[in-house]
Amino acid sequence: GPGLTRELARWMVHGAADISMREFDPRRFGEYAKPEWQVIKAREDYCLRHEIPFPHFNRLAGRPIKPSPLYERLKAKGAVYEEVYGHERPRWFAREGLEQRDYYSFARPKWFDMVAIETKAVRESAGIMDISAFSKIEVRGPDAYAFLDRLTPNRLPQKPGGICLTHLLNRRGRIEAEVTIVRLSQDQFYLVCAAFFEQRLIDHLTFSTRGEKAEIINRSNEWAALTINGPNSRDILATCTDAALDNASFRWMSAQQITIAGHSMWAFRMSYAGELGWEIHGPREHMLAIYDALWVTGGKLGLKDYGSFTMNALRMEKGFKGAGELTNEVTLPEAGVMRFVKMDKDFFGKGQTQESLEKPLPWVCAY
């Protein structure tokens, strides 16, 4: 229609549209979208044309296409999966005799009580989730720090092992993506963001280079990740590693390469769920063994599997923003994320951010 054409023209001329074009961006599909897969999905779309568009409608044709190392194990434990950028990610887990399938409703679906069980576990004991679907990009080289520092409003970690949350902006000073950046070594950085931003993040970084000696490497299909959260998460993880996990030895928003169940992995002390927790990132081939090892003790300490529905509920209650709110329709002040912005440094989009601060905000994210 004419609205789409208008935004496409703005995108071509100004480098960014006025509204979010995620649902029209061809980069919402990855390399997995081969011709044979496209045929399967086209047939599915035709068959679903007159179906009721329930919230969280799950399209099942052509799956699984990018299962994680934990896929079969979690499926056997009741995981009901969703597809994000080709990846299979658990939504929730069927328990207490509930059939392992999708339930649709405009009111309260049957999975609501299952999510409540998962949420309670993360708050009161511990929960574990397969987060392998996240985009995982490495930037390394002698100019890696200067390159990323020029793009990011927040101050990058000054030493290896530091972590920061920051945002990438487009030419209009609006949010392109929220990114967690981990400094693995002096000239090596690891970026984590939402699954469907994978190619967009790579493009944003690639098109922003100015001849810097910085290599951009996609680790999304090579590495897997899981997160363990809750009051008992430290005790559970401690049984699988000799690393010290106390507050003094392993600070909040810090990263260490530690041995877990005999495998060298990166542990990040951070938690999107808002509780005490760690994310564990590393080679795909080790993740199942680590998951099983955590369950040896975790099963005795109230550990439960949880999915994206629980994660989303917990992060909203904590006040953490998500990709749904952080779009190219909002500036940093409008999104309410200025605590992650250092106006005393230079960054791409700083001028537009300053303008937004000086004017009455047309709207703000209310939580």
Predicted region positions:
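C-terminal catalytic lobe of FAD-dependent flavoproteins
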Residues: 1-66
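Conserved, structured C-terminal
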Residues: 16, 55-82, 89-91, 95, ...
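Active-site-flanking structural segment that lines cofactor/substrate pockets
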Residues: 100-127
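Active-site acidic/histidine clusters and adjacent loop/turn architecture
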Residues: 132-134
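Short amphipathic
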Residues: 136-138, 365
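Internal amphipathic helical hairpin motif
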Residues: 142-175, 232-263
